[in-house]
Amino acid sequence: MKKIIFLLFVALFLCSCSSTIAPTAVPTQSQPASPLDGQWQGTGSTPDGKPFKVFLTIQNSSLVGLIYNFIGTDGIPCTAISYGQLPLEQQPQIVNNEFSAALGADLLATSKFDSNSHATGHLTIHWHDRQPRCNGDYEVDWSAAKQIPPTVQSSAPTRSSAPNPFETFIQIMIFGLSNGAVLALNAIGVTLIYSTVRTLNLAHGDVFALCTALVTSIINLIGIQQNWPPLQIAGGLLLVLCLAMGLGALLSVGVERFAFAPFRGSSRLAPLIATLGLSFILFQGALVWRTFQGSWIPGEHRSVPGLPEVPTDGIPTFLPEINLVKTLHLPFNIIIRFSDVFVIFMALALVSLAAWFMAKTRTGKAIRALSQGHQMAEMIGINVNQTIRRAFALGGAFAGAAGFIFALYYSRPFGSHGAQSGLFAFIAALLGGIGNPFGALVSGLLIGVVSSLSDYYLTAQWTPALLLALLMILFTWKPTGFGGEGEAESATVRDSIILTAPTQGSRVRNWFIFLLIALAVIPLVSPSGQIILRFAMIFILLTLGLNLALGITGMLDLGIAASFGLAAYVTALFTSKLDVVSMLVIGACVGAFLGLIKGFLAQRLRSDFFAVATLALGLLVRQVIINLDFAGGMGGIGGVSAPHFLNLSLLGQTQKYYLVLVIVALAAWTSHRLIASRTGRAWIALSEDELAASSLGVNVGRSRMISLVLSSALAGIAGTLYASTLAFVEPDLMAFHVSSMILTMVILGGAGNVTGAFIGALAIILYDKSIIPQLADWLALIWPKNAFIGSVPDIRGASFFNFGIVLYLTVLLRARKKK
């Protein structure tokens, strides 16, 4: 592994040298040094006040490099280094103290040098199809000052101000190490918690994000300012650190008590789903927190529909903005900020503290023993429940400390909430070895460096896809994780049965027939609700698909939205050329293809790792679609042709409605017959006891493959119907919140229950699309016009709490019934 990493860095470095040295091999005449030559640094802003930083390098009266950065929507800086070293033929000349040039398709730069030490200018930036958090069109007015180099003797040789290939490589490494250190900070808590319960905590990302929000809120509440005496600043920040660690520990212990303790020893998937429900609830807490703050920017939450604002208060910059290379008069043309060194040092300090705690303290030794297995730990007298609780408290405290360092480094909180936000931290924890803090640090730094190298030498828009692909490779290569083979949680009940609602024979069939008749009659009685009901029936189809995988086979597919969205995109591109029957077949095949990939993963991974792997697969497919120009990027594809069959276009809303209803009825009937068949009984036997089913002749890998292929095929058919009948597709169809909504529908209706799929999907969609809007309108009419009472409460904004509590309570109540 070490040799592979070393060879990777060497190859990338040689590629960088070959691509940047070649232009300079052309002989050129030496030119006299210009008074404008040197490093320039300045700031600017857009018309709406968005701050930018600008760095220029001038050599021989030519612009040889330009770098700019700004804060993205999630609070993390976006840095454009693509033009940090321009090829010789692309370097614009400064004529009459001015230059204007299109450095690329996404950047137009102009500048006027008022003197030899001051310049102003304008940047026109088109940042698209890279990181969505950075995307946008920006018009930036900036001003910059020339950086005065350290005084040298006249006899010293004059050094070029342009960075050479080696310096460029080192600069990228520094960016990567600082970003990787931030990732490693979050991974420390992940690895400590996971080592005891061996199930991913999907709410950990929300704990970390809320701790960063607490840090910025408390700093602003106390009013800590840069002009305070140093000891007073240090004392105030130390108090904030203690509060952040306390909040992190408290939230993390709460997650353990509510999401892990009730299911201990019974199921792997139940706590995973429960933490997803708590992720919804914690995000709702972030929204409530926001209402008490005076400023914020749009944030992200990947687990729920919509992207409302989350707490993102800015704070003063307490870390000195100095370049240590210039301050120490080092002979290198690179930038090493004090803040970069600070975050790397603090990551090392926290990792060392965690390693010392695990090796020297009684609790740490108990956690290490527990990571090897619960039964062995109990045999040597360890209190399992108490040790797990302490591990969560420790992991939460480290999440609070990491949140404190993150907020100081970026001067604002982490803006990405939800289950996805902790995914890359889990990659670092898995790569470094579960329960190994130093491994989490090294892998976090490695991921940061690989990301920076990919941003510069490849393309930034593919970096997230590269990291997600890395996670998939890690899972298939080392299914049990690196550095830990212990099984801390032993399941005694099959994963799907704990989520299954009790069936009642003929009563269930009667309800199923009643629902189909009602869906067929409602458009004739009330045509106005056809669009909402058609939307609900598409989600019924998706719920039927996930029901096959989760409710019957016990495999949680958190990437089912990828099959849905990919088939929708294929339909949008080809529906005008093929009839609806052909497109339904193609959509099913597209979904089935992703099902084959999931089936391969299922053959190598246990249930909870499989869930995380499918989550990563869904995000990977979405990122690839965003990066493809013909797919429309973030804007999607509109104006999709209406479905047609035998030269008859189904243009009317009623025609589209009954088309979807017929497909849903056929899918429900087929699903019911399949579950009752020999194949369905084999799936149920497999999920109840894999070893017993295998001894009876059930092919484990083949059975899971068939289940996941059929599940994804149904999702593909749903995607085709969505694109054909709603005439628009977008990347958010493949977003994680769609998979989460489908999961909620399955759990609410009862996993393994065809009628439950109808009930769950109809309940969620009608609540979200019909009941809540009407209730909000009614509340606005009756709400008193009284300033003391306040404005009308936004009950639509409470949807996240409602989804989370439904998901959590349904899993909890059914788990208790099974016990």
Language-model regions: role of each:
Residues 46-94, 120-122:
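N-terminal glycine/threonine-rich, aromatic-flanked beta-hairpin/loop signature
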Residues 13-16:
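C-terminal motif of bacterial Sec signal peptides marking the signal peptidase cleavage site
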Residues 245-250, 275-292, 340, 352-353, ...:
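Mid-bilayer segments of alpha-helical transmembrane spans in multi-pass integral membrane proteins
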Residues 205, 239, 265-319, 324-327, ...:
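Transmembrane alpha-helices and adjacent helix-loop boundaries
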Residues 166-167, 191-200, 221-226, 231-238, ...:
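Short, hydrophobic transmembrane alpha-helix segments
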Residues 23-29, 36, 82-93, 120-154:
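Edge beta-strand at a domain terminus
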Residues 18-20:
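Bacterial signal peptide processing site
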Residues 181-188, 378, 383-406, 419, ...:
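Transmembrane alpha-helices
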